From Swiss-Prot:
Protein role: The glycine cleavage system catalyzes the degradation of glycine. The H protein shuttles the methylamine group of glycine from the P protein to the T protein.
Gene name in the database record: gcvH
Name of the protein in its database record: Glycine cleavage system H protein
One family name in Pfam for this protein: GCV_H
Occurrences of domain Lipoyl-binding (ranges): 24-106
Record note on quaternary structure: The glycine cleavage system is composed of four proteins: P, T, L and H.
NCBIfam families in the record: gcvH, PRK01202.1
């Protein structure tokens, strides 16, 4: 069974979301997703400063098996990207909830609670991956 940390939020597209501040989150892909993808060989991320809309593709993860879109869990501005993935995309496989994070996002002030309320908790995500 894939690791599903209880302190994170999730999307049905297999992204995880960690609240990092009053209006900021860190985003990555889940253990389930990296396992299904196989060995990650390339990660395409947006530029810092880019605006992303909830549910829209913002990048790609390429593995030895396939190329998969990454979807924004919330509408926000990209405030940081994980530059380590350029030279070490395998971090997505080896540490999906840590060193393999993808982007940091900042939402409009005062909207994060509502945005996170639309995401899945660990139990909700577990139901998605066991269907």
């Amino acid at each position: 069974m894939s690791e599903i940390p209880a302190d994170l939020y999730y999307t049905s597209e297999h992204e995880w979301v960690l609240r990092t501040g009053d209006d900021t989150v860190r985003v990555g892909i889940t253990d389930y997703a990296q396992s299904a993808l196989g060995d990650v060989v390339f990660v395409q991320l947006p530029d810092v400063g880019a605006d992303v809309a909830s549910g829209d593709a913002f990048g790609e993860v390429e593995s030895t098996k396939s190329v998969s879109d990454l979807y924004a869990p919330v509408t926000a501005k990209v405030v940081a990207v994980n530059g380590d993935l350029e030279g070490s995309p395998e971090l997505v496989n080896s540490d999906p909830y840590g060193e393999g994070w993808l982007v940091d996002l900042r939402v409009e002030a005062g909207t994060l609670d509502e945005a996170l309320g639309g995401l899945l908790d660990a139990e909700g995500y577990r139901a998605v991956v066991t269907e």
